[in-house]
């Protein structure tokens, strides 16, 4: 692992800790089944590319429909038990502290199989000026 990778991983871990510490006072029954909170967005030194970080919260039983992104997605699970169905990789169950990589333009879905809220920190390295999420038809 090079120094750049180490810095990025350290930054991701720090942001994950910060995101996990942020609670919500809204009762669970009033929350959206899947909600996204954009944390940061930055241009990269690679022309036409940008990085985004988003916290995604899943209520018990909630599913994010099959979709893809115009770049890579790196997932850090903050809490709960989530099952990802990724084209070409099958189903993968992950829990708090686990990481997962979704290749660019790969359709996937995720569902919260736990009895409590599940949350992830999603880091995207994507093509700029393209929709972040494209639903499967």
Where are these regions (language model features)?
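Ligand-binding loop in jelly-roll beta-barrel domains
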Residues: 91, 105-130
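A short beta-loop-beta micro-motif enriched in histidine and acidic residues
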Residues: 45, 49, 61-74
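Short histidine-centered beta-strand/loop micro-motifs
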Residues: 64-69, 86, 111-113
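A short, N-terminal "cap"/entry segment at the start of jelly-roll beta-barrel domains
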Residues: 2-55, 101, 133-137
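Glycine- and acidic-residue-biased ligand/ion/polar-headgroup-sensing regions
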Residues: 70-88, 98
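Short acidic-glycine-tyrosine-enriched beta hairpin
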Residues: 58, 88-105
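Extracytoplasmic
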Residues: 51-53, 69-72, 105, 118
């Amino acid at each position: 692992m090079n120094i750049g990778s180490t810095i990025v991983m350290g930054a991701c871990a720090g942001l994950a800790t910060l995101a996990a510490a942020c609670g919500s006072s809204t009762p669970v029954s009033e929350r959206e089944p899947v909600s996204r909170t954009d944390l940061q967005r930055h241009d990269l030194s690679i022309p036409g590319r940008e990085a985004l970080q988003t916290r995604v919260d899943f209520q018990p039983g909630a599913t994010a429909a099959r979709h893809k992104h115009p770049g890579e997605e790196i997932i850090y699970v903050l809490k709960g038990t989530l099952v990802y169905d990724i084209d070409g990789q099958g189903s993968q169950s992950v829990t708090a502290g686990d990481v997962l990589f979704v290749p660019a333009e790969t359709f996937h879905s995720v569902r919260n199989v736990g009895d409590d809220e599940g949350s992830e920190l999603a880091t995207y390295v994507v093509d700029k000026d393209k929709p972040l999420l494209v639903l499967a038809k």
